[in-house]
């Protein structure tokens, strides 16, 4: 696949849903490399590729470099105020414009968790409920090596935790009991029925 600048973009590294491993590329299941500053020209090229891959997607909360075969601690994500998104994720509170983080990490604030359904480009046509910390303190660097830190709550905290998991060789299905895994079609049907019930009650 090529973008408007004729730069070839890599395909996603996908996992076999039964084994949760990839026979083609181990990048998605190993700890990614921590980057040093100043970033090399190769690092900057990889960041550009990741951003272009992200920009071509619709309804994409975030991507991590290992998802496209780049074993480096780079993530890109965005969470905007959106009424439709809030229907699916009522805990949407904090927002953040499109952001690229290098070497990100987080620490939970408290022990409270919230369960919600997640999906991933690296696990095709599968979703399941994942309990994530409701509130976290994050730390990262921008591409110039400037420190970034702050507090995230709700859906934004979930997105950050999900993407950082990729840098540690984890995917969301690692936290989901096999019997709770469903296809996206099954999930959408479940949500449709739930919303219909809510409309009846109101």
Swiss-Prot record:
Residues that hold Fe cation according to the record: 120, 162, 166
Reported cofactor(s): Fe(2+)
Entry keyword annotation includes Amino-acid biosynthesis: no
SUPFAM superfamilies: Peptide deformylase (SSF56420)
GO molecular function, a single term: metal ion binding
Swiss-Prot/TrEMBL catalytic activity: N-terminal N-formyl-L-methionyl-[peptide] + H2O = N-terminal L-methionyl-[peptide] + formate
Domain of life: Bacteria
Cofactor note: Binds 1 Fe(2+) ion.
Class in the EC hierarchy, top level: hydrolase
Pfam families membership: Pep_deformylase (PF01327)
Active site residues according to the UniProt entry: 163
EC number from the UniProt entry: 3.5.1.88
Keyword vocabulary terms for this entry: Hydrolase, Iron, Metal-binding, Protein biosynthesis
Function: Removes the formyl group from the N-terminal Met of newly synthesized proteins. Requires at least a dipeptide for an efficient rate of reaction. N-terminal L-methionine is a prerequisite for activity but the enzyme has broad specificity at other positions.
Similarity annotation: Belongs to the polypeptide deformylase family.
Name this polypeptide is given: Peptide deformylase 2
Organism of provenance: Rickettsia conorii (strain ATCC VR-613 / Malish 7)
